[in-house]
Amino acid sequence: MQGRRELGGEPLSDLQEEAASASLRVAPERLSDDSLEWRRTCPDLLLSDGKASISMPREGGSTCTARCPDPGEHSSTWGEFEGFRESSAKSGQFSQSLELLEGPTEPQPPRTTSAPKECSSHQPCQGGPWVTGTSAVPPSEPILSYENILKCAFQEITVQQAAEDVSTIDHFLEISSEEKPGVERVHKLCNESRKLWRALQSIHTTSTSQRLWSESRCQENFFLVLGIDAAQKNLSGGQGHIMEDCDLKEPEGLLTVSSFCLQHCKALIQTKLSGPPGSKQGRLMTCSRFLKTPSCGGGQHITIPRKRMFTPRKLKLTLFNSDVC
């Protein structure tokens, strides 16, 4: 009765928490692969201070102490505890882990280096020329670098360097296919274009160019290549005028120029048309070449209407790349 009163002084929740925290001890002598038996240790309740205390189990004993009450007793206070068993697979895994943790660590025997090994071509046997005492020194392996690997993979091939024989446009203009049979021409150059280009570079260009244009049989085709259509031009009454209703005179300095340098100036090709006053269409009389030079003041260029401007290189390519003959 006194024990019940002292137990009644403690709340039921505290007693249930202390009872639930009772430790479970595994009996290692009864572990097997099929089953794992758990035993519940019985707490010793010390009623002197009015609190329940749990005594730890002894080393050799796995059973409850003499003061441990029966599980069926005080069922209303402690509740009923039932034993449980786990499956054989889980218990086997758990027993193996416990054996590894609780079992003493046995020292492994030291490994001996006196085990016989097979001899190979790269590693000599014991007693070979590299053996000094009890330890064998491995042979020195060749040190491989990326440079050696690339040299072995991609071997160098000596190529004979030949001088490039690049023929310029002047070479094709001056030398014909008959003079050099080894050179095969893709496009046969026009003789009239060659004569005209040489005349433009000569000293007496004014008289020579007028004579060449008057004697040429490809004037109309060449003008069409340059974008000059003589049939659609407005006729001019005088040779000095460019158009009938225009009073602009051609500069006298340009008419008197006999030669010019192709490297420092640009060439102009001008068609001069003349015909009867009432006629709508005239015939092409002469064709002259003029310069485009900077004026004395302001650094501006003199521009003349009805004249198409070509650079020397463009004029040369237009002459020889177009089939005007």
UniProtKB/Swiss-Prot annotation:
This is Uncharacterized protein CLBA1. InterPro entries: Aftin-like, Clathrin-bd. One of its GO terms (molecular function) is clathrin binding. It holds the Pfam family Clathrin_bdg. One of its GO terms (cellular component) is AP-1 adaptor complex. Residues 1-32, 51-79, 92-133 are annotated as: Disordered. It comes from the Eukaryota. One of its GO terms (biological process) is intracellular transport. The lineage of its organism: Eukaryota, Metazoa, Chordata, Craniata, Vertebrata.
